[in-house]
């Protein structure tokens, strides 16, 4: 059971579609979720991070058939690749939700019955253009020339004329508008909120929640000739994930501890499902609405949309194997303003990592530890933070940095968090150059030497701590080189974490005479692979 005295935080990635291996966008969203979960754990929250896979639907059935596999085997193999990528990225998720899990069927049935009993499901004829890749009917006005889908321009939408069960989305037009008005923070960023408001203002139409002639999916509880539509099934995967392993799978058990979710992180391509369909479904079942849906932008490569047909897709595992997981995590969170579209360029990737992590941070730590060994007999400076002059520039910058960076993490402004931290790192480099401790040492000014070196080491410590949600292994290396027995992948109780956070996000936690191990490089300079 959760301790009611401990604050809680729950965050989800999308349940990724397993028609193909995980791509760069999947890795991006998951790194963001993991970073935020790590930050909330640092603060002392009891955290639940949910990721997983959406495994039903026609697209998956056809993909499996093309490989001469049954759909379950295809799903099982693809799930292994997702989990392998999450391990490579050092993702510490709490639950991995699979929509083929038998327990998920129990949740879907339970939820369906509630909505059925409410009178919000009915049988009717559906005619229209259907995109298999989107698993969605499209309005004719939204299609490209020759009925191609705008999101999948290489694929034609298929004309369908079939009997389906529908959800009365139109009944929730006014309740949704009230939700958006009363809770403006529900959809973020504001550009996504405006997209949804414009869509809803055009008038909501009921949407089908079943398909005929589809074997791969859960049968409709009241009509086994129909298969439940993938989104009416997949969105409930967030609820199934809330069940403890030994709990009987029903809605009551699933919702008692962690519902409603604090934050759904998604790509903007599935915004409508999460910000319109999902809250309407929950209203119908008389369940609480999640606190926020945040739709981030798309990733491009060298300014171009990525696609197999263009031959410019980026395998995230290749990037990680070449440069390391912390390099991957840092680049995408620092360089791409979360919520907006962003670009990946490998030369810029290498340049940013070398400038920030190898040069500014890594070299600062190495040169400072080298001076400590030379000028302080290898022991940490015999200085406490309280011994420093009130006008010490690094102390002035560091004294409010924890609050500034915490605020940036709360706003999902990871770029701002990194910029604030590296303002202190760059100031540390400038301070050493300006104060020239090698000259002070020659002048016999030992106290001034130790003041300078302590100030810089404490700036590095504070920077590493505040960077740890983004680059946990790099931060662990730095903390250990500063004499702490610390691992940012290990967690204590929320109360202990809260106490540590209050101390370590503040300036002045490095002790006097800290026992410092020999300096070692923390981040090796990156190089582009040689052209073949």
Curated annotation (Swiss-Prot):
Annotated Zn(2+) binding sites: 131, 134, 149, 152
A GO molecular-function descriptor: ATP binding
GO cellular component: cytoplasm
Keywords: Aminoacyl-tRNA synthetase, ATP-binding, Cytoplasm, Ligase, Metal-binding, Nucleotide-binding, Protein biosynthesis, Zinc
Motif 'KMSKS' region, residue numbers: 305-309
CDD domains for the chain: Anticodon_Ia_Met, MetRS_core
Cofactor annotation remark: Binds 1 zinc ion per subunit.
Catalytic activity reported: tRNA(Met) + L-methionine + ATP = L-methionyl-tRNA(Met) + AMP + diphosphate
Record EC number: 6.1.1.10
Binding annotation for ATP: 308
Family the entry assigns: Belongs to the class-I aminoacyl-tRNA synthetase family. MetG type 2A subfamily.
Protein purpose: Is required not only for elongation of protein synthesis but also for the initiation of all mRNA translation through initiator tRNA(fMet) aminoacylation.
UniProt-recorded name of the protein: Methionine--tRNA ligase
């Amino acid at each position: 059971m959760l301790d009611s005295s401990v604050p809680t935080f729950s965050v989800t990635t999308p349940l990724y579609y397993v028609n193909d291996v995980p791509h760069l966008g999947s890795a991006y969203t998951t790194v963001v979720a993991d970073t935020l979960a790590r930050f909330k754990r640092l603060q002392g929250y009891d955290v639940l991070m949910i990721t997983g896979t959406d495994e039903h639907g026609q697209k998956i059935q056809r993909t499996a058939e093309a490989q001469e596999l049954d759909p379950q085997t295809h799903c099982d193999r693809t799930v292994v690749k997702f989990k392998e990528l999450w391990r490579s990225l050092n993702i510490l998720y709490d639950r991995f939700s699979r929509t083929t899990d038998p327990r998920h069927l129990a949740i879907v049935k339970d939820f369906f019955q509630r909505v059925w009993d409410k009178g919000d499901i009915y049988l009717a004829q559906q005619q229209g253009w259907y995109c298999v890749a989107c698993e969605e009917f499209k309005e004719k006005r939204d299609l490209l020339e020759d009925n191609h889908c705008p999101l999948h321009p290489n694929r034609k939408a298929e004309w369908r004329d079939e009997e389906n069960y529908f959800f009365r989305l139109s009944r929730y037009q006014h309740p949704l508008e009230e939700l958006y008005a009363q809770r403006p923070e529900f959809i973020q960023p504001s550009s996504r909120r405006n997209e949804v408001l414009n869509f809803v203002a055009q008038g909501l139409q009921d949407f089908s929640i079943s398909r005929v002639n589809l074997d791969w999916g859960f049968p409709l509880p009241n009509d086994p000739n129909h298969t439940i539509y993938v989104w009416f099934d997949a969105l409930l995967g967030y609820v199934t994930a809330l069940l403890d392993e030994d709990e009987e799978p029903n809605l009551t058990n699933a919702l008692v501890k962690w519902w409603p979710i604090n934050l759904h992180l998604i790509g903007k391509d599935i915004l409508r499902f999460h910000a319109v369909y999902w809250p309407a479904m929950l209203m119908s079942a008389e369940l609480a609405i999640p606190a926020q849906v945040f739709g981030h932008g798309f990733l491009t490569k060298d300014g171009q949309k990525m696609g197999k047909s263009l031959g410019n897709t980026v395998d995230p595992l290749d990037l990680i194997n070449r440069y390391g997981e912390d390099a991957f995590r840092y680049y995408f969170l620092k360089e791409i303003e979360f919520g907006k579209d962003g670009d990946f360029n490998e030369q810029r990737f290498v340049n940013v990592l070398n400038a920030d992590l190898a040069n500014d941070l890594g070299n600062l730590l190495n040169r400072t530890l080298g001076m400590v060994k030379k000028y302080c007999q290898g022991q940490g400076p015999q200085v406490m933070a309280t011994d420093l002059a009130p006008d010490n520039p690094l102390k002035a910058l560091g004294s409010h940095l924890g609050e500034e960076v915490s605020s940036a993490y709360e706003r999902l402004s990871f770029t701002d968090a990194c910029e604030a931290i590296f303002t202190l790192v760059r100031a540390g480099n400038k301070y050493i150059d300006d104060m020239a401790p090698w000259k002070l040492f020659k002048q016999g000014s030992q106290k001034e030497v130790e003041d300078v070196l302590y100030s810089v080491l404490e700036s590095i410590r504070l920077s590493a701590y505040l960077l740890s949600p983004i680059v946990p292994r790099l931060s662990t290396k730095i903390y250990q080189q500063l004499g702490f027995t610390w691992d940012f992948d290990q967690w204590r109780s929320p109360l202990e974490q809260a106490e540590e956070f209050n101390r370590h996000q503040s300036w002045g936690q490095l002790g006097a005479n800290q026992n410092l191990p020999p300096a070692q490089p923390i981040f090796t300079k990156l190089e582009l692979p040689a052209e073949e």
